[in-house]
Amino acid sequence: MEPDVLVVGAGPAGAAVSILLARQGYRVLLVERATFPRDKACAEYLSPACTPLLAQLGVLNAILAAAPQRLQGMRVMDYRGRSCWGRFIQDGQCLYGLALPRLVLDHLLVEQACREGVELRTGFWVRQPLLDGQRVCGVSGQQAQYRETVRARLVIAADGVQSTLARRLGLVRRIHWLQHVAFVTHYASVHPMQPWGEMFLIPSGYIGLAPVSDTLVNVSVVVRAAHLAATQKTSQAFFAQTVQTHPELRQRFAQAIRVKNLLTTGPMAQRTACPQQDGIMFIGDAAGFFDPFTGQGIYLALHSATLAAAVAHRALCSGALSADDLRSYFLAHRRAFRDKYRLSALIQLGLRMPWLANRVIDRLARRPSLADIVVGVAGDFVSPKTVLSWRFATQVLL
């Protein structure tokens, strides 16, 4: 039987929207190229604002049972080696972020989707959208060696930053000056391990650390794509040299052992234009990508899924699935994340001026209450408008 909704991509965004629509009684087919459990290149950090969304999806208890690390806030070290700390704190109450492997998180979300009645098909490689005039009515893809088409009333693309559907429909808009490449892996025996997300600024980008278990640390290196190309080094050699040449990390990694393959993603920095075709929506990274220094990809995934599910429910009930009818989701998405995009762009500009980055971090180190506000924005529970104001800028810069 033809599904009401075809969701492409079973990451957090795809699994979340599938859960929400299945609860409304729709027949949902969720297709994924990989098989589970599967890993992803990700900082593996869930901001405090993710917690109520995970509870809404019915997976919070399962995630807490998986023993995630509870992060108290974030630390940022500037180019000179000076650090500022910001806590996850709101109205005097301490909050926390969660960190756990995507291998675990994605599997728990997909299991919940299946419990809600979602049909899951793994190993299905989507090749292109299926078009009926100006309407996207499904996808054509491949399962093992067999070509196949799948039709649905509504297609929701949750197929990530390299979205096949966005590219095939000509909707990808590259942000060339923000192109980065990310390398991610896990290390054991990093000393000391900190209950914080940590960011270390380096001339070409930054290094991120976050504990994901009692013994493992997620280590991410994010660099400008042009810088990586100019080094002419292999990914493995570049990653190892970048970590080992940082003064603090060289000491903390003296006994460390890499315990996972090095994962790579990028170049990344793009937005997806509002579809002109009927019958399709884009969520998560497929709808546009923040630089991970300020963006919180998993929160974006879950929140955009919530926005999309509400619009999709109204559209499916009324049968109004044209591009104009679905545009309300695009506008809601833009309202929800526009200021975070603006802040991301400003921070990336600042990171290209070490003197400015050093000045800001020095001020935040001297005024911890301001650092708490910045970290609250990164944690998705303080509005980006707070730090985009002239008043806040003068407090940090003057």
Each model region followed by its residue ranges:
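Residue-level detector of alpha-helix initiation sites
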Residues: G11-P12, F36-P37, V104
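FAD/FMN-dependent oxidoreductases across multiple families
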Residues: A66, A229-V311, A315-C317
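Glycine-rich FAD pyrophosphate-binding loop
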Residues: A22-C42
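Predominantly flavin-linked oxidoreductase catalytic cores and closely associated redox partners
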Residues: Q112-L249
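C-terminal helical "tail/cap" subdomain of flavin- and related membrane-associated enzymes
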Residues: H313-L398
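Conserved N-terminal glycine-rich FAD pyrophosphate-binding loop of Rossmann-like flavoproteins
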Residues: T35-A55
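A conserved beta-strand/loop capping segment in the N-terminal third of enzymes
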Residues: Q56-H107
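Beta1/beta-strand and adjacent pyrophosphate-binding region of the FAD-binding site
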Residues: M1-A13
